[in-house]
């Protein structure tokens, strides 16, 4: 299973359950191998020859690229399963340090002077592209918002980004373990994972507008 960065724990559990189900039906044991990284980077790896029986990436566009550039998937892959072959949805939230010292409540607070942002690189990370789209949507929905203002807002976000890791899990590590940045733009599950692993150190902030992410 070639998957995107923050799904290690999820697919470890899914694989365990599916392995038991498959053996009960067929008597066969399955050997699972997981590969995780930024979604765009993983798509390129499959296109370049990385073996995969299953791909579970962050964006439909990444799987489209595999379908377009290889013979591994049909171009109408989204029609093969219900819900456009999207098994679950998620969203983007902010993870801040305990007490929220920079008073970050919404997207507009991210570009205040002195706020250091952690988000992955949208060139390699699917989660980063969902972050980008959520920020764009918020800016465009403000009074007088338009594409030009949304573009300028997103530019400011990246100007105040301290580290651009290649994937979402790398960004979580940078923020939670290395202690860099004031706010992490995160998948919902990554934010909850950080709080569970380091209780008492972080808080989740839900912005007034986010995005319905549909990883296929």
Feature roles, as predicted:
Residues 1-124:
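N-terminal segment of the mature folded domain
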Residues 142-208:
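Ligand-binding pocket segment of bilobal, Venus flytrap-like solute-binding proteins
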Residues 99, 115, 140, 159-162:
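A broad detector of the eukaryotic-type serine/threonine protein kinase catalytic domain
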Residues 93-95, 203, 216:
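Residues embedded in well-ordered beta-strands
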Residues 7-13, 123-152:
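Bilobed "Venus flytrap"/periplasmic-binding protein-like clamshell domains
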Residues 105-107, 128-133, 196, 216:
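A short secondary-structure junction signal
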């Amino acid at each position: 299973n070639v998957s995107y960065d923050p799904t290690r724990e999820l697919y470890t559990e899914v694989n365990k359950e599916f392995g038991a189900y498959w053996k009960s039906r067929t008597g066969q044991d399955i050997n699972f191998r997981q590969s995780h990284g930024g979604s765009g980077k993983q798509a390129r790896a499959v296109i370049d020859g990385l073996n995969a029986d299953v791909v579970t990436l962050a964006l439909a566009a990444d799987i489209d690229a595999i379908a377009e550039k290889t013979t591994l998937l049909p171009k109408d892959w989204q029609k093969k399963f219900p819900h456009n072959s999207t098994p679950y949805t998620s969203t983007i939230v902010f993870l801040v340090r305990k007490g929220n010292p920079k008073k970050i409540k919404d997207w507009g607070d991210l570009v205040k002077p002195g706020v250091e942002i952690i988000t992955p690189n949208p060139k390699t990370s699917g989660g980063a592209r969902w972050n980008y789209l959520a920020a764009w949507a918020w800016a465009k929905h403000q009074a007088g918002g338009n594409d030009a203002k949304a573009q300028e807002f997103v530019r400011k976000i990246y100007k105040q980004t301290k580290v651009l890791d290649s994937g979402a899990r790398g960004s979580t590590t940078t923020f939670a373990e290395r202690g860099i940045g004031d706010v992490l733009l995160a998948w919902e599950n990554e934010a909850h994972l950080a709080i569970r692993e380091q209780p008492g150190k972080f808080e989740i902030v839900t912005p007034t507008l986010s995005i319905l992410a549909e990883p296929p």
